[in-house]
Each structure stands twice: as C-alpha cells, then as structure tokens.
C-alpha cells in the first residue's frame, strides 16, 4: 500500500505543477492581448476624443469669456449706488 502512495503522490504533484505553468502562460497571453487592445484604442479613438474635448472647451471658454466681457463693459460706469445715495 505504501509503495502505491509514492507514485500517486508524484503524479499528483507533477499534475499540479503542469497546471500551474499552463495557467501562468495563459495569463501572460491574456496580458499581451489586453496591452495590444489598450495600445490600439488611444491611437485610433483617443485622438478624436482629445480633439473633440479640446474644441469643446475652447468654444465654451470663448462663449463664457464674451459674456463676462460684455457684463464687465455694462458695469464699468455703474458703482452700485444711486446718484442720490453716493
């Protein structure tokens, strides 16, 4: 009985080791695929998104800037009090 336990234990250990190595190799392959996908996304789509965001911010700043400028011009002579009060 004892002589059967050693080879069985050896087979189980070798099986566990081989499964572990296969899993590590599979994980490495999945990491490479995800890196490739991440590398493609910013190059193709990222440029369009960046351009859209920058253009949107520029137009927003221009619109808000003009409103602030116009509001400032209308308030230049206005001190905030009536002529009778000051």
Swiss-Prot record:
The keyword Signal appears for this protein: yes
Superkingdom of the source species: Eukaryota
Keywords from the UniProt entry: Amphibian defense peptide, Antibiotic, Antimicrobial, Cleavage on pair of basic residues, Disulfide bond, Secreted, Signal
**Cellular component terms per the entry's GO annotation:** extracellular region
Pro-peptide region(s): 23-36
Span of the secretion signal? 1-22
Disulfide bonds, which pairs?
A: 81-86
Cellular location of this protein?
A: Secreted
One biological process term in Gene Ontology: defense response to Gram-negative bacterium
Tissue specificity here reads: Expressed by the skin glands.
Similarity field: Belongs to the frog skin active peptide (FSAP) family. Brevinin subfamily.
Q: What the protein does?
A: Antimicrobial peptide.
Q: What's this protein's name?
A: Palustrin-3b
- What is the species of this protein? Odorrana versabilis
């Amino acid at each position: 009985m004892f002589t059967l336990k050693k080879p069985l234990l050896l087979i189980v250990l070798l099986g566990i080791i081989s499964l572990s190595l296969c899993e590590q190799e599979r994980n490495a392959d999945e990491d490479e695929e995800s890196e490739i996908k991440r590398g493609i996304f910013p190059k193709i789509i990222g440029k369009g998104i960046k351009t859209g965001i920058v253009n949107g911010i520029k137009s927003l700043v221009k619109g808000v800037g003009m409103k602030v400028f116009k509001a400032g011009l209308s308030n230049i002579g206005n001190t905030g009090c009536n002529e009778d009060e000051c």
